[in-house]
Amino acid sequence: MSVAGLKKQFHKASQLFSEKISGAEGTKLDDEFLDMERKIDVTNKVVAEILSKTTEYLQPNPAYRAKLGMLNTVSKIRGQVKTTGYPQTEGLLGDCMLKYGKELGEDSTFGNALIEVGESMKLMAEVKDSLDINVKQTFIDPLQLLQDKDLKEIGHHLKKLEGRRLDYDYKKKRVGKIPDEEVRQAVEKFEESKELAERSMFNFLENDVEQVSQLAVFIEAALDYHRQSTEILQELQSKLQMRISAASSVPRREYKPRPVKRSSSELNGVSTTSVVKTTGSNIPMDQPCCRGLYDFEPENQGELGFKEGDIITLTNQIDENWYEGMIHGESGFFPINYVEVIVPLPQ
């Protein structure tokens, strides 16, 4: 820095110190200028805040945002064109539903519904990706340019104006001690900077409809996202309602105990022509008989009670649910699903 530059910096610092510490008054700018300066300051703050909050709106998870930023930085360093996309919550939920829907199988009503919902969630994630790209290109990038160019340029003019004001005020108070030419130059430079700063702020604020247009584009993108999401969800809701109606019309199956599978050696113990010893009866195995799988306590007249493992002689099949048989000299009816046939009734 030149000697003249050092002197000017000293003058500015001296004047600033005088104003801050001693309470000396500097040159006051007009109210209209100060109002424009205030609006520019607020605009600077709101643009910075909107850029941050819009990113949070599109990508709410800070950990994912940090990871994504790191991965994309590494990709750029490596010269890779393809970047990693933000994992949308709809997509993550859709992946979960698809995974377990497929595990439940095609014969599961719940499983099939999970697959339908999962596929719809994946579609919504794609729509959200489109929103991210659209908003970045049409809203975030223009705002970033506004911050980096227009507002930065205005800030530069205001900073330069403040420096020249301090230099002007310092020299104005020392008229007679400082050459008149230096004072005159300080006045000219101050007025020049004021005019530049004032014009740049005026032009920016007069054209703020451009920012309104950017907001309108952002809202249009958000509306399109919600419209497409609504269509996907409405179609999904119709499918689920149809699935519920279809499931309601299917007759309910009744639970039937399934007999435990046993090997022939476990069932017979000996050849079918031998006699099996049971609790209280010796029954030749060449006549129709069955083995009790569970204890059966008769509740109605005519029913035949027995214990698990008892061998019952079969005399008749009443219908698809009941047998007639004998044990311990007593005869009666008993449910088919309580026994396992050893020697079937003749056809």
From Swiss-Prot:
Q: Name one GO cellular component term.
A: postsynaptic endosome
Per the record, residues carrying Phosphoserine are: S265
Q: Which residues form a coiled coil?
A: 181-201
Q: Which SUPFAM superfamilies match?
A: BAR/IMD domain-like (SSF103657), SH3-domain (SSF50044)
Q: Which domain of life is it from?
A: Eukaryota
| Membrane topology annotation | Peripheral membrane protein
Q: Where is this region: Required for dimerization upon membrane association?
A: 60-87
**Domain annotation BAR: ranges:** 18-249
> Which stretches of sequence are listed as region Disordered?
248-271
**UniProt note on tissues of expression:** Brain and testis.
The protein's UniProt keywords, in alphabetical order, are: Coiled coil, Cytoplasm, Endocytosis, Endosome, Lipid-binding, Membrane, Phosphoprotein, SH3 domain
Q: Is Membrane one of the keywords?
A: yes
A Pfam family per the record? SH3_1
Q: What does the annotation say about its assembly with partners?
A: Interacts with ARC. Interacts with DNM1, SGIP1 and SYNJ1. Interacts with the huntingtin exon 1 protein (HDEX1P) containing a glutamine repeat in the pathological range and promotes formation of insoluble polyglutamine-containing aggregates in vivo. Interacts with DYDC1. Interacts with FASLG. Interacts with ATXN2. Interacts with BIN2.
Give the family this protein belongs to, as stated in its UniProt record.
Belongs to the endophilin family.
Task: Name the chain's protein.
Answer: Endophilin-A3
Q: Which organism is it from?
A: Homo sapiens (Human)
**Gene that encodes the chain:** SH3GL3
